[in-house]
Amino acid sequence: VDGARDAAARATAALIREEQRRLETFLARRVVPFPPATRVLMVAPHPDDNLFGPGGTALKYVAAGIPVHGCCVTDGRACVAARSERARMAGRRAAEERAVARFLGVGEPELYAIPEDELARPARQDEAVARLETSLARARPDALFVPYFLDLHPLHRLVCHLVARALERSRAELRVCSWALGAFPPPTFVVDVTAELPRKRDAARLYSSQQELRDYVADVEFAAAFHARAYGPPEASACEIFFAQPRAEFVADVLSRGLDSPEALAAGAQPVLPEEPAR
């Protein structure tokens, strides 16, 4: 009994220390024009993620003359239920991603086009890591943007694991800036994108495949407004937020969590879309 109580006390003390660290990070958060960088690489699990997360910040980098490169790991085909339609959806989403990159003024995106429903396979993961290593070597970023590794979407978490594998062998000194749709620690950087929101909204409309599934533009607006209300300065009506870590800390943190395990991929997973019945 005493041993169990001691273990529980240690676990509670560790939890309190972690919450204290989070509070200190929150109090130290900085409202910045954009996270410091001279070269930027943004990694998207799906086409549209680089707009939804850091799209307004990308616009600010472009306006400042800072090169922004983007890559997308999967083809996003699994947003439709019918397998017979998935190849067509993949092509459509690739065209949308290129159109949005042109609209934002960022570089031509690198589309790995790995079938979304195959990324859980080890061979596909190895392929993604190799492609990520090439993208990192080509872009030579000092700021790397990815989804938060405990994001509620399992594929976002898996892509973070693959990014960490690619970074593990890199000696590059860079800062990893994570964004999230759901779970998130207190942000390191808050970026006021009030002025950029209209253009981000217009870019979101170019993802017509997503707008047909849900009110995608409203989702973009809501996330920006929520972040402004929760973390932004009083004058901001739209913000993007980022949790920043040095490369080595990010790699150690992510690779310690087994995010590529079947259990992790199943945790919080969205229901798998059923095959539409034959007619």
Task: List the predicted regions and their residue ranges.
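Active-site beta-strand->loop->alpha-helix modules in alpha/beta enzyme cores, enriched
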Residues: V1-L174, S178-W179, P198, R205, ...
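A short acidic, often aromatic-flanked loop/helix-cap motif at beta-alpha or helix-coil junctions
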Residues: E116-A120, F184-P185, V251
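A conserved mid-domain beta-alpha-beta active-site/ligand-binding segment of alpha/beta enzyme cores
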Residues: P186-G232
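Glycine-rich phosphate/pyrophosphate-binding loop and the adjoining helix
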Residues: F226-D253
